[in-house]
């Protein structure tokens, strides 16, 4: 599936949010790129909604067509559409690998999943958008444990907090999905209601 592969820092500056996490280039210049980047622009309601949608898309590495499908599914579900949307995004396999601390960024997590390094309930899954469910068990393949990305993951495990809906067993680099996340457990700088308003027009 096509995805954005351009400079993430530029997107972070455009949307005024660190899409990577710990992006020093963004921290030095947290304003839009270009010669008028520091200029104050009057932001319309539509622009705010669009920016929030783009923030979510680029944070999770999802293209527009797929993101709209997530919104439509969230809208069909019971409960708040915004909460449902974030839950669908958070339970992507690549995001779970990132949240568990087995990858430094979501982009790296997506690559690790695509290369077939993970098993879900004993079955190889190489689709980053695969949706995990409550009680799923995610393992790193035995042959992959000795590769550099997972050696680094083992050494750095614990540097980033793991959300309460997940548990990581460090000895085996196993991820346990205890539940689907609630909104309070999703630590992303998003106003999801603006995304709902954007698509509701």
UniProtKB/Swiss-Prot annotation:
Family the UniProt entry places it in: Belongs to the universal ribosomal protein uS4 family.
One GO BP annotation of this record: translation
PROSITE patterns: RIBOSOMAL_S4, S4
Signal peptide: none
Annotated function: One of the primary rRNA binding proteins, it binds directly to 16S rRNA where it nucleates assembly of the body of the 30S subunit.
PANTHER family attached to this UniProt entry: 30S 40S RIBOSOMAL PROTEIN (PTHR11831), SMALL RIBOSOMAL SUBUNIT PROTEIN US4M (PTHR11831:SF4)
Any matching Pfam family: S4
Subunit (UniProt): Part of the 30S ribosomal subunit. Contacts protein S5. The interaction surface between S4 and S5 is involved in control of translational fidelity.
GO molecular function: rRNA binding; structural constituent of ribosome
The keyword Hydrolase is annotated on this UniProt entry: no
Record-linked InterPro entries: Ribosomal_uS4 (IPR022801), Ribosomal_uS4_bac-type (IPR005709), Ribosomal_uS4_CS (IPR018079), Ribosomal_uS4_N (IPR001912), S4_RNA-bd (IPR002942), S4_RNA-bd_sf (IPR036986)
Protein name: Small ribosomal subunit protein uS4
Keywords recorded for this protein, A-Z: Ribonucleoprotein, Ribosomal protein, RNA-binding, rRNA-binding
GO CC annotation: small ribosomal subunit
Species of the source: Nocardia farcinica (strain IFM 10152)
Domain S4 RNA-binding residue range list: 91-155
């Amino acid at each position: 599936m096509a995805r954005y592969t351009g400079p993430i820092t530029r997107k972070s500056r455009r949307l005024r949010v660190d899409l990577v996490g710990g992006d020093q280039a963004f921290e030095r210049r947290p304003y839009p790129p270009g010669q008028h980047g520091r200029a104050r622009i009057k932001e319309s309601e539509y622009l705010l909604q669009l920016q929030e949608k783009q923030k979510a898309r680029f944070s999770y590495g999802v293209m527009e067509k797929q993101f709209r499908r997530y919104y439509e599914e969230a809208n069909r579900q019971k409960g708040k559409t915004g909460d449902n949307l974030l839950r669908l995004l958070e339970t992507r396999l690549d995001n779970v690998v990132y949240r568990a601390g087995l990858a430094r960024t979501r982009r790296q997590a997506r690559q690790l999943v695509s290369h077939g390094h993970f098993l879900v309930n004993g079955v190889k899954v190489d689709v980053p958008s695969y949706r995990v469910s409550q009680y799923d068990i995610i393992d790193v393949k035995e042959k992959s444990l000795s590769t550099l990305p997972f050696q680094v993951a083992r050494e750095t495990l614990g540097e980033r907090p793991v959300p309460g809906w997940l548990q990581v067993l460090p000895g085996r680099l196993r991820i346990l999905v205890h539940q689907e996340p609630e909104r309070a457990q999703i630590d992303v700088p998003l106003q999801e209601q603006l995304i709902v308003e954007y698509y509701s027009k």
